[in-house]
Amino acid sequence: MDSLQLWQRYCDWLYYHPELEIFVDISRIRFTPAQVEALRPLFARAFAEMQALEAGAIANPDEGRQVGHYWLRAPELAPTAEIRQAIQDCVEQVESFAKKIHCGTIPASGGGRFTELLWIGIGGSALGPQFVAEALAPLQPPLNIHFIDNTDPDGFDRVLGRLAGKLGQTLVVVTSKSGNTPEPRNALVEVELAYRKAGIPFSAHAVAITGPGSQLEQQARQEGWLAVFPIFDWVGGRTSETSAVGLLPAALQGIDIRALLAGAATMDKATRVPHLERNPAALLAMAWYIVGEGRGRKDMVVLPYKDRLALFSRYLQQLVMESLGKSHDLQGNRVEQGLTVYGNKGTTDQHAYVQQLRDGLNNFFVTFIEVLQDREPGIPSPFVEPEVTSGDYLDGLLQGTRQALYENGRDSVTITLPRVDARSVGALIALYERAVGLYASLIQVNAYHQPGVEAGKKAASAVLQLQRQVLEVMREQKGSLTLPQLAEKLSCPERIETLYWIVRHLQANGRSLVLVGDPGRPLELSIQPRPA
């Protein structure tokens, strides 16, 4: 296909939303008219299923749940008056609370305004807020945000170290839908301890975002925390950015949450259109399906040419991979579906792995994200060369990479935003939420549950239970044991490798036992009680 034919293909398949000023270009995905026609019946089904989902049908059959994240930015579409009111009340409560924090009506326990925000969450309770904070937070926000999004003790120490001397001005928000997810629970325990050691009342600094009736909600209300915000049963973590999970941190940082919601709502309206060529999310889903042969055979490399959007690929990893990575389809057939996502930002990645993308394995397609506005209005861009700015270089490198990849048989999609603001970020989030939902319908998987995550939690629980048994044995043990002897004593010879991992970790942290011998020869090690 020559350059003029490519230009015509670009014009034929370009989607533009005049209100949002967003472009979607799938012209550099190699597909034929026959492939498009073959997908039309599948899209007819996908549009119908999406319409039923928005009307309140059970769209998560494995858990018997409705799926209602689209209602969050269009409460009038919610199936009941109670849900509509709950959504509206939540947004108003978020705005009111943020205003009281900003103006000092709700002061820090030691007096004065809060200046720091410590956000505790995992998965969608962290990835969305992190992405939006990086993309939209002002240079001097009302509160500086810090994240704990793991159960890494060293990570806790580093974050709390940065807050040394500032805990008295720090607002702590704990986010957990179930209220007993281990990672945020562990962080809560450690942060509470830090407040006790500092002699600061934790409850006067604490906020919960959780499901109604959860263990976390009960604790927050019993201890008199500053506020409790809801996570609705019909909102999943990876689609929670327009719920209190995403709106509260944004509002506290001074981000316009009404604009974020408006951008998402406007994109939702566009992606509700039951016509393939006029629906930008359907165009993305079609591109993914064709390039990966409906089996996710090619990875999606996300390259936003904007520093503010550098965390978008991490956010998309969860949204896409947790939604689409399923072992079985809706009919119970084993399918092992998925779509791998990775990326960082342009032009950095051109000096990292784009070499392989251009000349190595052709097992991917690229999603370029272009932002037309180089800097904030009123800030001039100097010329770095005659008639060329740094932003011109950024744009030229995006175009050059797109062309170089296509010329070597590498496909790509390009999303163009007018600027990075709350409205466009809300629209971008909504675009991909819908694209994932439509693609899930095409391949017939449940996009709204995550059994693999639960399997990992159960396995971890079994490891910790075995560790408790090891500690109990070693407290009573007078002499040394080998690993096989320990396994026999615990009646679990089949778990000897797990035992090795456990005792190695316990020794490294100075707990209850010591290992004598060469750690590289596990069967020769002697396990001894640690001297008192």
Curated annotation (Swiss-Prot):
Localization per record = Cytoplasm
Q: Please verify whether the record's keywords include Isomerase.
A: yes
Q: Which reaction does it catalyse?
A: alpha-D-glucose 6-phosphate = beta-D-fructose 6-phosphate
Q: Which domain of life is it from?
A: Bacteria
Query: Which BP terms from GO are recorded?
Result: gluconeogenesis; glucose 6-phosphate metabolic process; glycolytic process
Q: What is its EC number?
A: 5.3.1.9
| Xref: SUPFAM superfamilies | SIS domain
> In which pathway is this protein known to take part?
Carbohydrate biosynthesis; gluconeogenesis; Carbohydrate degradation; glycolysis; D-glyceraldehyde 3-phosphate and glycerone phosphate from D-glucose: step 2/4
- What is the first-listed, main subcellular location in coarse terms? cytoplasm
Extract one GO molecular function annotation from the record.
monosaccharide binding
Q: Which residues form the active site?
A: 322, 351, 457
Q: Name one GO cellular component term.
A: cytosol
What keywords is this UniProt entry annotated with?
A: Cytoplasm, Gluconeogenesis, Glycolysis, Isomerase
Q: Which Gene3D superfamilies match?
A: Glucose-6-phosphate isomerase like protein, domain 1 (3.40.50.10490)
Instruction: Please name the HAMAP family in this protein's record.
Output: G6P_isomerase
Q: What does this protein do?
A: Catalyzes the reversible isomerization of glucose-6-phosphate to fructose-6-phosphate.
Q: What is this protein called?
A: Glucose-6-phosphate isomerase
Specify the species: Synechococcus sp. (strain JA-3-3Ab) (Cyanobacteria bacterium Yellowstone A-Prime)
Provide the taxonomic classification. Answer: Bacteria, Bacillati, Cyanobacteriota, Cyanophyceae, Synechococcales
